[in-house]
Amino acid sequence: MAKQPHLLVEEGDVHEIAIIPGDPGRVDRIADLCDDSELVAQNREYKIVNASYDGTDLTICSTGIGCPSAAIAVEELSRVGVETFLRCGTCGALQADMEVGDMVVATGAAKEEGTSKRYESVEYPAVPDYDALTELVGAAEDNDEEIHVGPIVSDDAFYNESDEYVDDWNDANLLAIEMEAATVFALARRKGLRAGAICTVDGNLVAGNQKGADSDDELPEKAKDNVERAIRITLNAVTAL
């Protein structure tokens, strides 16, 4: 098979498990916590590194912001051998008791985005793989980390999340909002692959604190610290999968 047109990888270039942050800068941050790493390819928003952690080989690939670019990453990585996708990103809290720096493991994602709907009807569930979900939760518990576990929402319009929308999501007891998980979950399910997601809270929309970091350099200090903790949880989950 020829190199994929956007990720510029082919069969044999990547491993079966991939961590997929949004921010290309976070690829290096994840790689720095691994035992060794090697740059595989870099094009547009996609930076791909192979690494190993505690004896397990993995690939790290940024997806950029939003579901369209995340879908390209999942599509092309799955064509060259990736079977498990773990999103490690940031989110905005939708419940008043959640603070900046809290971590969320998603049990499902409401489809307030357009990409997954090009693949299937909105009625089809966007849910993580059971093993990916339980290993993320288990890795957090093994490290005595406090996390929120529950449903989230994936949305396309970062700057158009109105008070009405936020109130509706809050009333539905959705925990947080981000921009990629619904499509990652839906595509993985359709392909018979595994996917999970853990996100660090970088703002609270109910409290009026707009989530506002496009990169790790812009995150509040507490969120920066907990992004690293979320990365470690994800890496430990990788070794169990």
Swiss-Prot record:
<keyword id="KW-0808">Transferase</keyword>
<comment type="function">
    <text>Phosphorylase involved in the non-carboxylating pentose bisphosphate pathway, a nucleoside degradation pathway present in some halophilic archaea. Catalyzes the phosphorolytic cleavage of guanosine to guanine and ribose-1-phosphate (R1P). Exhibits the highest activity toward guanosine, but also shows lower activity against inosine and adenosine.</text>
</comment>
<dbReference type="GO" id="GO:0005829">
    <property type="term" value="C:cytosol"/>
</dbReference>
<comment type="similarity">
    <text>Belongs to the PNP/UDP phosphorylase family.</text>
</comment>
<keyword id="KW-0328">Glycosyltransferase</keyword>
<dbReference type="GO" id="GO:0009164">
    <property type="term" value="P:nucleoside catabolic process"/>
</dbReference>
<dbReference type="GO" id="GO:0017061">
    <property type="term" value="F:S-methyl-5-thioadenosine phosphorylase activity"/>
</dbReference>
<protein>
    <recommendedName>
        <fullName>Guanosine phosphorylase</fullName>
        <ecNumber>2.4.2.1</ecNumber>
    </recommendedName>
</protein>
<dbReference type="GO" id="GO:0047975">
    <property type="term" value="F:guanosine phosphorylase activity"/>
</dbReference>
<dbReference type="Pfam" id="PF01048">
    <property type="entry name" value="PNP_UDP_1"/>
</dbReference>
<dbReference type="InterPro" id="IPR035994">
    <property type="entry name" value="Nucleoside_phosphorylase_sf"/>
</dbReference>
<dbReference type="InterPro" id="IPR018016">
    <property type="entry name" value="Nucleoside_phosphorylase_CS"/>
</dbReference>
<dbReference type="InterPro" id="IPR000845">
    <property type="entry name" value="Nucleoside_phosphorylase_d"/>
</dbReference>
